[in-house]
Amino acid sequence: MKKLKIALLQICPCNTLDENLKKGIEFCRKAKERGADIALFPEMWSNGYNIYERPVHAWLAEAIDADSDFVNAFGKLARELDMAIGITFLEKYADSARNTMILFDRFGDNKFTYAKVHTCDFSVESNLTPGEDFYTAELDTHCGMVRIGAMICFDREFPESARILMLRGAEVILVPNACPMEINRLSQLRGRAYENMTAIATCNYPASVPDCNGASTVFDGVAYLPHDMDCSRDTCILQADGSEGIFVAELDLEQLRRYRSSEVHGNAFRRPEKYSALTETKINEPFIRLDRRK
């Protein structure tokens, strides 16, 4: 089996929706030229996650429909290029907006629409409507069928996000991002991949974008190889620098599947009957926050 090629579009946003559309299309075409099976954008590409230091009404006015020309253009492009695309945008949603990603398969079909569940309610994202759930879907690629899931930026701070996606069969988790990927956040991703035996691909904005630093990554989730079980390996198969560009990782699906079928993590030895505290909703000190969404 050929390796699954995931292209992380670590690129700078422009000033308008139309400019971001044109640049997004340009870089998807470049990703296809490099053999990508999946192209992933950073968080909220439609407006470059430009929601800070601005009046809330100004950036909420930039929300677009999930069925907008901007979004549909990437569905058509996915079909033209024979390449899956994870496009991100500020979605108009009822009287509010959501932080959303749509995964189009290589035939241009919408496999799922995911809205960020863990909105940053301690900041301006408190004005967004959170997503309702985590989703996975079977993605038809040139490597065969692959079950894909997604979470967005702050979602990765919570182990439950990746855990639920693993329980729903995700082999690969796509993570659009817009924040500094420093050592602790990178360690989170490494841990999520390790404990779930799941590949995790994160696409961030480059260092030229305020409060971002590039460092997009792919962790393949395989901590040990069959012929070398005494020595662990680094699961990071790609880490970008801070520059703008397309960073392509080649994921060995056969290796990942062999590992998942025999190793001890993921759902192999869990004891969910012991985890009832995870679903309790009462919050005690020191974790009470007045700005937490009810």
What residues fall within each predicted segment?
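Active-site catalytic loop in hydrolytic enzyme cores
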Residues: 66, 92-168, 176-177, 181-191, ...
